Amino acid sequence: VDASEWTYTTGQIKEAFFKTEGKVQRALILAGTRVDGRQPDELRALNSEVDILPRTHGSAIFQRGETQALVTATLGTPRDMPIIDGLCDEYKKPFFMHYNFPPFSTGEIKPLRGPSRRDIGHGELAEKSLRAVMPATDQFPYTVRLVADLMESNGSTSQAATTGGSLALMAAGVPI
């Protein structure tokens, strides 16, 4: 069929898709299953391992279903603290986290051009969560850098980065 013979508008196609999607979701709910085949009360499989990278201070891999994060912890001296120059006065940051969500983790082929808004936002979310359990600098006078590399993604990537981060911190000997 030649595309010029189609009589449906883009709006009509979107509306039909939306209605079909609603019917499928309703059928799944009534059948008591999720899109991936799990029952409503069934959790995704969990797996974790620490110290998988021998040359880092701490490392962990955390997997929940088809989402996997490889997180490394590196310890430095107080002189290694990055100086943050924002809208207010400069300050030093004893704990910081980088979150990398490369295209291959979702099966996409895109160029890597630095962190995206998503990378920055999810990294801030995970960093804020973990900062709450970090020891005070007078008790633990080190700079701590976490790097979370998402290896696979099927949802809950910031949760995987946060959980993997806590495991990597413990593997590095950080008293959280």
List PLM regions with ranges.
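Extended amphipathic alpha-helical scaffolds
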Residues: V1-Y91
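Mobile "lid/hinge" segments at catalytic clefts and subdomain interfaces of large enzymes
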Residues: L169-I176
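A short glycine/serine-rich beta->alpha loop
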Residues: P111-S116, A148-S156
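Glycine-rich, flexible beta-strand/loop modules in the N-terminal catalytic cores of phosphate-handling
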Residues: I52, H57-Y142
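Short helix-coil transition sites and intra-membrane helix breaks within transmembrane domains
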Residues: A136, N154-Q159
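Amphipathic alpha-helical transducer elements in NTP-driven molecular machines
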Residues: G123, Q159-T162
